[in-house]
Amino acid sequence: MKRGKVMKKKSRFLTGLLSAALALSLCAMPAMAADNGETITSTINTAQKGSLTINKYEGDKQDPEKLLDGVTFTAYKVADIVQSTEAGTTDVKMQPVEALTKIKSDIQITSETKYDDIKDTVDAALAEDANPKLTAFATATTGDNGITGQAVFSEMPVGVYLIVETGAPSQIVNKTANFLVSIPMAKEDGTGWNYDIVANPKNAAVYGGISLKKYGKNYNPDGTFSEVALSGATFYLQRKEGDDWVTVTAPTVSDSNGSVDASGLLTTSANGMINITDLAPGTYRFIEYSAPQGYIMDGQAAYEFTINNDQTVTISDAYKDTLANTIKVVNEKPSMEKQVKTGVDAYGKATDASVGDVVTWKVTAAVPSNVNKLAKYILTDTMSSALTWESETEANLTIETNPNVKLDKDTDYTLTVPEDGTEGGTWTIEFTTAGKEKLAANNVTSISVTFNTRLNKNATVNKEGNLNDASLTYSNGFKSNDEEYPTQPDPKDEVIKNEASVYTFGMNIEKVDGKDSRGKLQGAEFDLYLYNGSETNPTEAELKNNGVKVGHYTTDVYGEIHVSGLKNGTYYLVETKAPTYNVVENGETKTYSYNLLKEPVKVVVNVQYEVDTKTTITTDANGNVTTNKIESKKYVGGENDSGNYKVIIKNNKGFNLPTTGGFGTLLFSGIGVLLVVAGVGVLLSLKKKNRT
């Protein structure tokens, strides 16, 4: 009977303790005993140490893909398990620790106790002024043991422990509720004890997203611009952790909106987007690493934003896009154009001129708003040998800005020019630090430089014309010296080259015998005039008054004159001396002159030309070079569309007659016919009178 009573008491104890252990473990989150095959006994081995393994999941499911590192738990021992045996009966009690009984002497922890029942007492025992204070047994952080999402407390003496989640990543907005766990716990079948406990608490996690859209601000030379979505720009994403910024090496990026490499470098997609999801609440920033060719990379800007606990995003108005939750980042791309004066107030890509004419050129360049941060902003002009730099005075190089700002030579810029009288040569305008600051401070959007050259004898006649090219050299970015920024590449040079052209044309004059064109007439002399008047058949006097004498020329042994360096216009050749020829009469050689042309010979030079610009981009060790080279689109005029006009002039012997086939010949023949008719009429009239 006695033995039976003892067994009944033990059984009641086992059932009660099992219930207590399960109740304690179920106060907040489930815990279970790990079946490690230990020998089952009906009493607790109070000298044995146990362990608590916590597997931490995000959300409310035990999803292996959602194991969470970085969660810290703290264990506080709140009760000892005390065993006593009397008369063969084992009695087990949960005895609260002194830190709790000092606060509340009658505190009890039983199988029915929940954490909320002892919360106030625990809070008081954790206060700084508590004496004694409830101290932590140990802390453990998931992932620290090398297993994702797992934290382990080991060497835990037998007792009841309060488990508190004391640290978690920012996406965890609702921490695991505090829970109690006993070491050991009864096995589920009630047959014994397990000292190695497993708990699987869960959290409510919150994530947010952010988008970045990259725009290219493409400047026209006059400072106007358009914005386009810009692909191929790269960024790093950093997260603020305490006082430090740490690069996010594996952000989650939408496949269609950006890409990321193994280092965490993000690249904008074809639509200029980077779309990042699954960001835990916290403060972040984008740092630009590189910009596409031609664009200026702003490596000093930090595009900061905050993912809030309610999943909203806070973005500074300074770079907030019109798209929701989107940061707007703009890269600027300057441009430059070379032009030549084509009219009173007109400029274009090509004009025509005569040798000796003044040709005025214009270089126009866009000024980026961040020009003051660039190491270089330089304008250069290179003239062909067909262009003479007469002097700085004659060149009258003038710099204008929009809006108008006075720039001081040697303070705001330096100017180097060719020596006076140089055929060809280069001038350079390099803006100083002070000059770049002045441009930025005054919001200057464009610069134009005009200057004069003179077309010289080196001018050639061809469909490419005589080129003059300009270039703009600027730095393609500026980086930060902040040590917490990702290491950025050093800026390189971007060079834009642009051409304009001046055309000139020619005449090939051939003097031949009026009856035999094989006879080439040497020694004929002509004056060539460019006529600007309104007379249909101007006389030599009219040409002298309202024309410009181009030159005086004499036919060579082949009867030819070659004239080049002519612009489009109406020209007249005035013969001032006719060629001569020899005749042997009665054994004696006599010299006679051909007839001198009675009126000027008209020659219209009208070459129609158009040019296109072909752009090529090359890259070298110093940076990128964009060349905008002129290509002929249309070039029509002259013999075989060469720009050279062929003029054949015939001279007759014997009388001072006009050129064969010319209007003068027709007039002379007409007068002769009229005289013959008149003579016949007179004879008929006389005969009639005689009859009467």
Identify the role of each PLM range.
Residues 2-692:
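Solvent-exposed loop/turn and edge beta-strand elements of beta-rich ligand-binding domains
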